[in-house]
């Protein structure tokens, strides 16, 4: 939607009307937003909810989207305060995401794995928060198991444009799903209130039968499906401009990623030379030790942020804690993230990172967490996602309490890694500094992978091979990342592109404010508004419309 449309209506936009639209939109999204493997879009689903992708439900989404969009367009007003203009554009991004889901990436028509997420992933979504399991959660679990048959029936009707690489991934994911789902529900049954789910066993068996039949159905059809998974340049640009509000072309994104990759590789080389002879990081002895170490580290990071005047951390912000990966989640590893960032209704509960037992054969990120939890905590916990979303849940402006796009969130998490590195948090651990540069290297490589997958320059297999060789990660991590990024174009660029946008925003603020610039104040604004795309933060903080004009097709002025 052009900036001129969004900001030129003669009618005066009402803040109350915009807030009402936001409430209506997010209530609707809680009932219709797809389950994904991204840990940031935490929705408060209605009790008893289950995904519905029947033809009637899809048509209902289109009808409701049109109604909400008309209300949004009627609230455009160039004379409204800047904060209201930002909120209006932010809600426009949310509406654009629904259009992207339906007609852009269109996973419900193209990706058989989408329905694995709506079934098995929906079960993981119920199991992810820590115990206790009350009767409401028991009913939610049963509702999602019972919905599997109808969801997978709808899948067969909907997948008119299914792509073979996605189908092969879904077939592989569902291999052995019966014992895995049975193990998960049997384990969680021991946690449920007596009598709260008397049909759990039968419901599990019915879901297993539906999933196994779906897998068999895919196996009979995958050979006739097209191999191409790219969404194409036009759709990708639409995502950047309307959903993520990122004002760059694919070619500019590639240049940014490659420059950041060169920087990360160079700095990793400098660090390795500096650290020659330093001992390797040992594994923690067990999960209990890892949990205790992570708790001490999280507290120390809070103190460090205050001591260095980097960021204000309210004393009552809930903790980011490690917990032992329970058997019900262990059985379903790979079907969802293993971090629970709570939600608006659970804002006081804090965030949980579920951890497996520390062994040398863990994947790239889990292994680093078992060596020095701080490397994970600064991105995922404090001052990263867990802290950012906790602040977001408290935002005085209710429009900004929700997740819209991961570009700013992941950019902030990546920025936090490097901020803490440069601020000296890891001065006591040379190998952890190297680890952070390895993280930055992988995140830079993700830009290339994201763009090339979206434009057709990489197959999923080529993307995985590229990540494994260039980032030096294990094969499973590379495969999972490539598959996930192919299914969610535009997601993987956010880590580096968001970080670079933050760097540019900081530099512009320092230049504009001169001696009045305070890093802590800048960070406090940035973190509080961590759900707001950085092109909108630039408008609000600096009064700079250049990035929004670029989104609307007007040339940027350097």
Predicted stretch roles:
Residues 1-9:
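Bacterial N-terminal signal peptides
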Residues 12-558:
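N-terminal maturation segment of proteins
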């Amino acid at each position: 939607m052009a900036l001129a449309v969004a900001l030129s209506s003669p009618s005066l936009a009402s803040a109350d009307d915009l807030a009402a639209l936001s409430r209506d939109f997010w209530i609707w999204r809680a009932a219709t937003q797809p389950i994904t493997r991204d840990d940031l879009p935490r929705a408060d689903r209605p009790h008893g909810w289950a995904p519905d992708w029947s033809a009637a439900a899809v048509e209902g989404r289109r009808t409701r989207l049109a109604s909400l969009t008309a209300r949004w367009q009627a609230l455009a007003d160039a004379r409204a305060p800047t904060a209201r203009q930002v909120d209006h554009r932010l809600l426009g991004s949310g509406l654009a995401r629904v259009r992207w889901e339906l007609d852009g990436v269109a996973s419900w028509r193209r990706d058989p794995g989408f329905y694995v997420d709506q079934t098995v992933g929906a079960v993981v979504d119920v199991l992810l928060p820590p115990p206790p399991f009350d009767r409401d959660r028991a009913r939610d679990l049963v509702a999602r198991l019972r919905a599997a048959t109808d969801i997978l029936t709808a899948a067969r009707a909907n997948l008119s444009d299914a792509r073979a690489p996605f189908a092969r991934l879904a077939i592989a994911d569902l291999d052995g799903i019966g014992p895995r789902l049975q193990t998960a529900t049997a384990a969680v049954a021991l946690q449920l209130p007596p009598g709260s789910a008397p049909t759990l066993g039968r419901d599990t068996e019915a879901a297993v039968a539906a999933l196994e039949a779906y897998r068999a159905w895919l196996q009979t059809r995958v050979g006739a499906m097209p191999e191409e998974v790219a969404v194409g340049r036009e759709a990708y640009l639409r995502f950047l401009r309307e959903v993520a509000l990122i004002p760059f072309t694919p070619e500019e994104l590639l240049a940014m990623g490659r420059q950041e990759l060169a920087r990360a590789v160079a700095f990793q080389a400098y660090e390795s030379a500096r650290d020659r002879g330093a001992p390797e990081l040992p594994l923690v002895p067990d999960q209990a030790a890892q949990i205790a170490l992570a708790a001490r580290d999280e507290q120390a990071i809070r103190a460090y942020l205050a001591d260095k005047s980097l960021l204000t951390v309210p004393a009552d912000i809930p903790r980011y804690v490690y917990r032992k990966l329970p058997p019900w989640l262990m059985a379903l590893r790979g079907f969802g993230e293993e971090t629970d960032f709570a939600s608006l209704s659970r804002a006081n509960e804090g965030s949980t990172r579920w951890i497996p037992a520390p062994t040398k054969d863990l994947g790239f990120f889990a292994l680093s967490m078992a060596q020095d939890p701080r490397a994970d905590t600064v991105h995922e916990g404090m001052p990263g996602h867990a802290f950012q979303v906790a602040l977001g849940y408290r935002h005085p402006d209710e429009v900004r309490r929700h997740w819209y796009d991961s570009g700013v969130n992941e950019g902030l998490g990546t920025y936090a890694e490097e901020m803490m590195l440069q601020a000296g948090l890891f001065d006591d651990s040379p190998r952890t500094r190297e680890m952070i540069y390895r993280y930055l290297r992988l995140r830079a490589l993700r830009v290339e992978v994201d763009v090339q997958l979206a434009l057709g320059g990489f197959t999923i297999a080529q993307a995985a091979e590229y990540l494994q060789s260039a980032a030096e990660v294990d094969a499973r991590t590379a495969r999972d990342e490539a598959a996930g990024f192919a299914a969610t174009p535009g997601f993987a660029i956010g880590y580096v592109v968001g970080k670079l946008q933050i760097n540019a925003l900081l530099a512009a603020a320092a230049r504009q404010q001169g001696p009045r610039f305070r890093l802590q104040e800048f960070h406090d604004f940035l973190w509080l508004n961590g759900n707001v795309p950085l092109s909108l933060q630039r408008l609000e903080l600096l009064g700079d419309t250049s990035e929004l004009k670029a989104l609307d097709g007007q040339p940027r002025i350097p």
